[in-house]
Every structure is written in C-alpha cells, then in structure tokens.
C-alpha cells in the first residue's frame, strides 16, 4: 500500500526530530533484553549477558544506530521501499541468516521507542503511518526469503 501525502508528511515531520543514535541503540537494546534468544546474532559484540551490559555495550549502541539509520532511508524512499531494501534483504537472508520475524519485532520496538521519546508528535495518525511504514520495511527486508 502506498503512502498518501498526509502520511508522508507525518512520517517526515517526526523523523526529522529523531535522535537516531539514541533511539536506535535503545531499540536494539530493548529487543535483546525482551527477546534474549535473539542475542545469538550478536555473540561477537562482547558482554550482552544482562540488561545493564546490553544497554552499555558500545557495539549494540552502534549497531542500533546503523539499523535505525537504515530504517530512516525508508523515510526518504517511501514510494520504493522494497527496491531500496533489496540488497539488505539479500544480505540478511543469504549471509547473515537472520530470522525474518526479527524485522517485525524490531519494527514494533522502534514504534514503542519513538512513542516514548516523542509523545506530543506520536498521535494516532502518526502511529498508524509508522505502523504502515514498519510493516512495509519488514516485508521488504523479508522479500528474499523463500
């Protein structure tokens, strides 16, 4: 489903306020805390044995920033999300072997983090637009999976 002009405006207006490093690190940290079995993808990140270690792990924070920056690319390519993420989908499928369900889980956590940090901006319509965006990004990232 494509985005209408109002949805594009809502997504863009909020995105310009987002602290990508902080929110990205928090989102990935939350995923690793809430879903500890996902830590297996990050075993080379050092100590991720508990919530405190995860929240203060520089590699987790840096990768969270990278992930959210990549998510932000979708904001710039709302009319071509699937094509934009084709190579990243291939990487996650063929090389990293990441369970595509993780994209949905992390997308939901990103929404929680954005809502917590930007409550005045994250109203019902903005939430709906971001939910649509998260679904499309997750589907694009899962596109190479069979």
Swiss-Prot record:
User: What is the protein's given name?
Assistant: Hemoglobin subunit beta
UniProt keyword Transport present: yes
Summed up, the tissue specificity of this protein is: Red blood cells.
Q: CDD domains annotated for this entry?
A: Hb-beta-like
Q: Name one Pfam family in it.
A: Globin
The record's subunit annotation is: Heterotetramer of two alpha chains and two beta chains.
Name the GO cellular-component terms: blood microparticle; haptoglobin-hemoglobin complex; hemoglobin complex
Recorded hits in InterPro entries, A to Z, give: Globin (IPR000971), Globin-like_sf (IPR009050), Globin/Proto (IPR012292), Hemoglobin_b (IPR002337), Hemoglobin_oxygen_transport (IPR050056)
| Modified residue annotations for N-acetylalanine | 1
A biological-process GO annotation? hydrogen peroxide catabolic process
Q: Which residues form the Globin domain?
A: 2-146
Q: Name one GO molecular function term.
A: haptoglobin binding
Role: Involved in oxygen transport from the lung to the various peripheral tissues.
- Residues recorded as binding heme b, renumbered to this chain, are 63, 92
Q: Which SUPFAM superfamilies match?
A: Globin-like
* Family that this chain belongs to: Belongs to the globin family.
């Amino acid at each position: 489903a494509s985005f209408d002009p109002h949805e594009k405006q809502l997504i863009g207006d909020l995105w310009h306020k987002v602290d990508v490093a902080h929110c990205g690190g928090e989102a990935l940290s939350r995923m690793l805390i809430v879903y500890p079995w996902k830590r297996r993808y990050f075993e080379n990140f050092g100590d991720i044995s508990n919530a405190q270690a995860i929240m203060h792990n520089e590699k987790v924070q840096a990768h969270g920033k990278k992930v959210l920056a990549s998510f932000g690319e979708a904001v710039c390519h709302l009319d071509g999300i699937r094509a934009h993420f084709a190579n990243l989908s291939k990487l996650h499928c063929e090389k990293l072997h990441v369970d595509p369900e993780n994209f949905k889980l992390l997308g939901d956590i990103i929404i929680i983090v954005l809502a917590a940090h930007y409550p005045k901006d994250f109203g019902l319509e903005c939430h709906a637009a971001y939910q649509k965006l998260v679904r499309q990004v997750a589907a694009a990232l899962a596109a190479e999976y069979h």
